[in-house]
Amino acid sequence: MKKEIQVGILLLLIVTMGCQSGKKKSESKAISEEFPSEMVNFKPYNNNPVFSGSNVNTWDNLIRERGYILMENGNYKMWYSGYKGDENDPKYLGYATSTDGINWIKYEDNPIFDKKWTEDMFVIKNGNQYYMFAEGENDITHLLTSIDGVHWQEKGDLIIRTTNEEIIPAPYGTPTAWFEEGKWHLFYERNDLGIWLATSDDLITWTNIQDEPVIKIGPEPYDAGAVAVNQVVKFKGKYYIYYHGSTNPNWANPNENALWTSNVAMSTDLIHWEKYPNNPIVKGDHSSPILVYDGKNYRLYTMHENVWLYTSE
């Protein structure tokens, strides 16, 4: 009898372990279907950073916040924010190009736009025109347009309204635009405490889809202190949002330690988002992620405070 009991217990353990293993495999498969490897698995280039400020007494001694990279006709184009080094120094717009996404040449007449504080920019090309959404002074988003990506025209500050048409006071920054089926969408943050979504017909006046954030901070430590969107990508029928987060809600205090992270979330409707269970997607204090398709694979760049390159695993 004793031997039979022992055999029974052993069989029960085997069945239990098999069930647990099957459950883990099922969960892993579900994650990989929602977050394909191309979207989340990257390894750092072995000679980072690939771009940085001048580190001498120039207008772009340092770079900060999100820059943006597009690849067009085999050439990489980068827009970035430069400043002399003090947080209160105005931030101006720089431009650089590359044929391989590694070796960059700064435009000889930088800064290409210095009429207004311009940082944390997002660039999208629609038709024959480039649109840039950028933070101005005091985190007020403004719009610029260009035909060639170099010469920009200021179009004014954005106006964002609640669902009840009440104007939202500043700040509203880290703007990220998405254009689909004739409709413009804008993701933005307010003091990095959440990510909101609005739509517009004229690119200046925007109305919230809902007055609650579509992405909230937390609950995991990697984005418990702050969140802000950098980019939206559509891949195999799903939307992937690349965003940065902070571990510390007091990140603005220079005396506090705050780790900035690069993260991903997925949606099927731009409103309801599921965060990647294995966030953050890169190690260390590297944030403001931008995904670029090089013609064969996706590569990831983190833009703050130097530009790091990551390739697909």
Model-found features: residue ranges?
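Carbohydrate-active catalytic/glycan-binding domains of CAZyme proteins
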Residues: 19-313
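Hydrophobic transmembrane signal anchors and adjacent membrane-proximal interface regions, especially
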Residues: 2-3, 235
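Hydrophobic h-region of N-terminal signal peptides that target proteins for export
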Residues: 12-18
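Sec-dependent signal peptide recognition
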Residues: 3-10
